[in-house]
């Protein structure tokens, strides 16, 4: 019996992926692999629009709450975890469904990754200690000496990427920009992918949804959620978790850098920019089935398309 292709349900923020996912789960014995770099974090539920407890009870969900906000999770980690999950889910006679909007994760899974050295905890701690004393701009200047191409595209305060680029240089003896031209390892050849892409027919309609969604998060307690994170001494604005859209704006508000209204407007604007980047990536993918996420019956349309590829 042939294994059905992997359905990838992709789309920008506020496109309605969650509702479509649940509709699919009512029809097939699915398990969801979340393709989302924010919902991996524990204690970050409201601002990430994480599936509710009731939704998680309806269908098995993977790659939720797998990291503390102080911890890193890379595209390479996602690829490793997802390939193992796909094998396990299929071995149990169930169907994996990839759903989410972190396009780098889709790219890593399908196209593979470059052979970069793994992070070294000792070296990472040394770099963080130096940054605490010298500041990230000083480490950015050091990176510019090792790898001017990578340094030129990074902000002097982009701590995560500066740290990683310096790690690569110091561990491998080569510039990250040079290593990124190396050979990639694509997904196993027996995996086939079908992308169902939820895309808006009208940009203004998506923007309205984004504003409504962000306001709903504020009403649900996003400020309190960020305040709780901010009370931790091991979290700071340079971490990927805190830089998530919505969180960094509320963090700035709680730091007194902006007013509440400014944080709201900046959060909505940042979400729109995220959606724009997501759509730009999707539109560059030639093989995708497009569903208008603003039309009535979007979830039913997704089910109809999936039925072309899934058994039963």
Swiss-Prot record:
GO biological process, one term: tRNA modification
Catalytically driven reaction(s): adenosine(37) in tRNA + dimethylallyl diphosphate = N(6)-dimethylallyladenosine(37) in tRNA + diphosphate
One of the record's GO molecular function terms: tRNA dimethylallyltransferase activity
UniProt key word Nucleotide-binding: yes
Cofactor(s) needed for function: Mg(2+)
Enzyme Commission number(s) from the entry: 2.5.1.75
Binding of substrate, residues: 13-18
Sites where the protein binds ATP: 11-18
Class of enzymatic activity (EC top level): transferase
Chain positions of site Interaction with substrate tRNA: 102, 124
Keywords: ATP-binding, Magnesium, Nucleotide-binding, Transferase, tRNA processing
Region (Interaction with substrate tRNA): 36-39, 160-164, 243-248
Subunit structure comment from the entry: Monomer.
Role, per record: Catalyzes the transfer of a dimethylallyl group onto the adenine at position 37 in tRNAs that read codons beginning with uridine, leading to the formation of N6-(dimethylallyl)adenosine (i(6)A).
Family of this protein: Belongs to the IPP transferase family.
Cross-referenced PANTHER family: TRNA DIMETHYLALLYLTRANSFERASE
Protein name: tRNA dimethylallyltransferase
Gene source species: Bordetella avium (strain 197N)
């Amino acid at each position: 019996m042939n294994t059905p292709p992997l359905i990838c349900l992709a789309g920008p923020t506020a496109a309605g992926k969650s509702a479509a996912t649940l509709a699919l789960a009512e029809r097939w014995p699915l398990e969801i692999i979340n393709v989302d770099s924010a919902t991996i974090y524990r204690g970050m539920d409201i601002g990430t629009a994480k599936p509710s407890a009731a939704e998680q009870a309806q269908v098995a969900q993977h790659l939720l709450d797998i990291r503390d906000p102080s911890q890193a999770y890379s595209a390479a980690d996602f690829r490793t975890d997802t390939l193992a999950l796909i094998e396990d889910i299929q071995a149990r006679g169930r169907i994996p469904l990839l759903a989410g909007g972190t396009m780098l994760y889709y790219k890593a899974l399908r196209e593979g990754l470059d052979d970069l050295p793994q992070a070294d905890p000792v070296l990472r701690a040394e770099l963080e200690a130096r940054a605490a004393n010298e500041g990230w701009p000083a480490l950015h200047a050091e990176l510019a000496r090792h790898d001017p191409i990578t340094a030129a595209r990074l902000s002097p305060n982009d701590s995560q990427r500066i740290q990683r680029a310096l790690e690569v240089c110091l561990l491998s003896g080569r510039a990250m920009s040079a290593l990124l031209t190396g050979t990639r390892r694509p997904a196993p050849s027996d995996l086939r992918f079908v992308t169902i892409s939820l895309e808006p027919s009208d940009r203004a309609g998506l923007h309205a949804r984004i504003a409504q969604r962000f306001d709903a998060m504020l009403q649900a307690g996003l400020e309190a959620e960020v305040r709780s994170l901010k009370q931790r001494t091991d979290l700071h604005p340079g971490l990927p978790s805190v830089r998530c859209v919505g969180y960094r704006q509320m963090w700035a508000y709680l730091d007194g850098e902006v007013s509440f209204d400014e944080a709201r407007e900046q959060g909505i604007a940042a979400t729109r920019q995220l959606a724009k980047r997501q759509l730009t990536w999707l539109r560059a993918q030639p093989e995708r089935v497009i569903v208008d996420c603003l039309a009535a019956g979007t979830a039913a349309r997704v089910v109809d398309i999936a039925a072309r590829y899934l058994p039963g």
